[in-house]
């Protein structure tokens, strides 16, 4: 039968363990206000957008491993692409997959970037296509291993971090409505993606 309304609070789809305990009258949440993880521009974005200015940004940007020729922060690459529907409400973009591969190849082969790299996509189908392309391509496996290259959705990156994150948004005007709704309604996952 259908779950009782009271049981819905235990649904991992809608609530994290933190959410469940934070609503308990016996437990007081603790907010870790200092952040050392991201460049100022990224941490400031998360602070203003998700934390109402409560974060203390304590990152030493001089210790961040940035690719040659770039400064720490958010960099945007616009890609003309077709967003295709995938099963389960997700979507994918073959053009984004190709562009991300080219970026990784440029970083690891031409620029010999020595930091760790993560690639995050909001949709499982896009993450799988990215992983298959990158690990099945011409980039030497030892370079991918040295970069600790990890491709996943935001769920797979919670609690993890990399020196450099590439976020394959897989978004556009013709994206499926369900996918657009997912991005709009899961802002916490967007925060995970940009703050790793």
Predicted segment positions?
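Conserved helicase motor core of SF1/SF2 NTP-dependent helicases
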Residues: 1-196
């Amino acid at each position: 039968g259908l779950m009782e309304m009271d049981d819905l609070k235990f649904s991992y789809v809608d609530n994290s363990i933190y959410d469940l305990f934070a609503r308990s009258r016996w437990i007081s949440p603790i907010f870790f206000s200092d952040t050392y993880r991201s460049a100022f521009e990224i941490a400031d974005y998360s602070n203003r957008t998700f934390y109402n200015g409560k974060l203390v940004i304590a990152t030493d940007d001089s210790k961040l491993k940035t690719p040659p020729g770039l400064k720490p922060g958010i960099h945007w690459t616009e890609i003309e692409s077709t967003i295709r529907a995938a099963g389960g409400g997700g979507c994918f973009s073959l053009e984004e997959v190709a562009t991300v591969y080219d970026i990784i190849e440029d970083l690891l082969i031409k620029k010999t970037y020595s930091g760790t790299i993560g690639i995050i996509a909001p949709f499982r189908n896009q993450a799988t296509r990215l992983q298959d392309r990158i690990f099945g391509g011409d980039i030497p496996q030892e370079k991918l291993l040295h970069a600790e290259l990890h491709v996943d959705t935001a769920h797979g990156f919670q609690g993890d971090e990399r020196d450099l994150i590439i976020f394959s948004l897989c978004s556009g005007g013709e994206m499926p409505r369900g996918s657009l709704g997912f991005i709009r309604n899961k802002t916490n996952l967007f925060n995970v993606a940009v703050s790793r």
